[in-house]
Amino acid sequence: MDFSSEDAFRAGAAALMDNCLSLGLNTVLVQVRPFGDALYRSSLFPWSHLCTGVQGQDPGFDPLDVLLTEAHSRGLSLEAWVNPYRLKSSASLPGTIAPDNLICTHPDWICTAGEGVYLNPAIPEAADYV
């Protein structure tokens, strides 16, 4: 999807929803919390790097709102897919961590596995945050 502007994103979202309809689908599943960040305006999580290439940078519009509008205008339902624990999957995703990412704000809540960084659900405060 093209996040360069709201109009470009809306055009991509419309094409996606039209394709879903042509396939006979009635529900679209959208990942909205990929790396401890969000593809929607949030007071708890920084903007996803998938929006602008930089985690924490506001794209100037709410991608989830656009997706919801385009889905609902076609009679499609939309379900949000949330990764509640994954904060980073490798040395390159996301490349730069926003200062308000949980890796920075609560380093005592994280654990690592391979190249991944995760919120540790065994820590009560981290589990409550989710």
Predicted features along the sequence, with ranges:
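Aromatic-lined substrate-binding rim segments of carbohydrate-active enzymes
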Residues: 16-17, 34-83
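Conserved, mostly hydrophobic/aromatic
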Residues: 20, 28, 71, 78, ...
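Aromatic/hydrophobic pocket-lining residues that form the small-molecule binding cavity
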Residues: 9, 13, 60, 64, ...
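Hydrophobic transmembrane alpha-helix bundles
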Residues: 15, 19, 65-71, 115-126
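Active-site-adjacent "subsite" loops/lids of carbohydrate-active enzymes
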Residues: 1-10, 79-80, 85-130
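Glycine-rich loops and low-complexity Gly/Arg-rich segments
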Residues: 23-24, 52-56, 103-106
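Catalytic domains of carbohydrate-active enzymes, especially glycoside hydrolases
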Residues: 11-38
